[in-house]
Amino acid sequence: MAALSPTFATSTQDSTCLQDSEFPVSSKDHSCPQNLDLFVCSGLEPHTPSVGSQESVTFQDVAVDFTEKEWPLLDSSQRKLYKDVMLENYSNLTSLGYQVGKPSLISHLEQEEEPRTEERGAHQGACADWETPSKTKWSLLMEDIFGKETPSGVTMERAGLGEKSTEYAHLFEVFGMDPHLTQPMGRHAGKRPYHRRDYGVAFKGRPHLTQHMSMYDGRKMHECHQCQKAFTTSASLTRHRRIHTGEKPYECSDCGKAFNDPSALRSHARTHLKEKPFDCSQCGNAFRTLSALKIHMRVHTGERPYKCDQCGKAYGRSCHLIAHKRTHTGERPYECHDCGKAFQHPSHLKEHVRNHTGEKPYACTQCGKAFRWKSNFNLHKKNHMVEKTYECKECGKSFGDLVSRRKHMRIHIVKKPVECRQCGKTFRNQSILKTHMNSHTGEKPYGCDLCGKAFSASSNLTAHRKIHTQERRYECAACGKVFGDYLSRRRHMSVHLVKKRVECRQCGKAFRNQSTLKTHMRSHTGEKPYECDHCGKAFSIGSNLNVHRRIHTGEKPYECLVCGKAFSDHSSLRSHVKTHRGEKLFVSSVWKRLQ
């Protein structure tokens, strides 16, 4: 909703300044300023006061009040509109330079509390003209916004409102009003009821008035030069610029943490309060504010009121929707000052900055090892815990998590109808077979644009390119082994997560499952069940037979990421990589990957 402030309403036929004779000054003493030597919304020419001295605008001039009987009649949407208007009015006064002390009403609204009865009626004694028993005060709130009285049906007389009635249609719906009411009524019979100096917003000069009026006609005159985002007020632009500059002028007095917006500081200050009076009836979690409890309840109810207009995806919190929308717009407002890299979310920038600072905020309480990323820390913690193992029923292989076992099960479930005629290997489809055939023919169709090296598989080319870009590697938090991608490291972590429960009675070695122990026992018995069809040579382990067969087929699936040379077995590749040591700084990371 646009920023709303109570303003003077003028007829389209008469937009001139109001005369003093239209405003009889009561002899009673009250706090509403009757005469201000300022520009007002009802006219653009200065007006000279005839009575009294110049007075400043107070919060009472822009406040709307409710009695104890009227407040319960408002529904939640009406109360929300009341809160938004009051907070925005107070913000407008302070941003325009008025020295306005914070009323207790504003303090309660900022704390997500309902205003107390005495605070809602605190302003009623200030202006005798506000006593209107024939209508509710929320009608006055709508008069502030639209310049008309709603329940009795007052004419829509504000200048330029006729063209914008559709723009404010949703507000009429909120208050159950008919936007086409035209019966002329007012607070004072025979006079324009809204041409009142004691009830409106006044400005020191034309620039302030122009800025204020832009909030009503939808103009956004203040544009950010960095991202071209536009705002209706300069104060909003100033707050937005802090995202780019990193300025955080609002500091917490308790812990020293700084923020770029006062509302963020207020939310943070509540974390220091020990009292959490709002309890969740379903899970027992406690919260400091009622609004926080309401947001939390969406976890249980499944309510997702914030929906994306482009893809229809819904979220339980507005901040999550704002972050999601950046995936459509491509906006990356959070920029790193060290390298210039931009991010869509502040948490992503925070994690990225650790690459420059070397900060490792996640420390293990058991062994003292520190980590830069929370994901690595969580994986490391599992090393200290006894994890349940997930074993494959088909082959007996065990995994540290259910997801890894599910991925492994595809090996047994998926049929492999395509067979290689040279080595007898089977594959799921022709494209995989075609890539495999390159290991027999020696064809290397995937060439590096930077150094000209060629590879038989596209995945090997992708891994090779990381040598040129010095792309960050994925290191195992438990043993330090380095991997070229996240999935490879995740598969490797199952080695550390799975408890070795089966022990060999002859040599004392421990293994993860019975199938691994069974293979190991052949080293003691001398059994060699795997025999080569070409030469009759036998092996105790099936993988050794597979390596041996490559001698007959000529298959060389292991390629060097540095020079592209291929080998039939992994150990030969490891020996070859040692010859590159000293040639390039990146070879050390390649060597680590082969350990």
UniProtKB/Swiss-Prot annotation:
Residues 57-128 form the KRAB domain. The keyword Cytoplasm does not apply. Belongs to the krueppel C2H2-type zinc-finger protein family. Isoform 1 and isoform 2 are ubiquitously expressed. Isoform 3 and isoform 4 are expressed only in lymphocytes, spleen and lung. It is found in: Nucleus. InterPro entries: C2H2-ZF_domain, KRAB, KRAB_dom_sf, Znf_C2H2_sf, Znf_C2H2_type. Residues 109-128 are annotated as: Disordered. This is Zinc finger protein 317. GO terms for molecular function: DNA-binding transcription factor activity, RNA polymerase II-specific; RNA polymerase II cis-regulatory region sequence-specific DNA binding; zinc ion binding. May function as a transcription factor. May play an important role in erythroid maturation and lymphoid proliferation. Keywords: DNA-binding, Metal-binding, Nucleus, Repeat, Transcription, Transcription regulation, Zinc, Zinc-finger. GO terms for cellular component: nucleus. GO terms for biological process: regulation of transcription by RNA polymerase II. Signal peptide: none annotated.
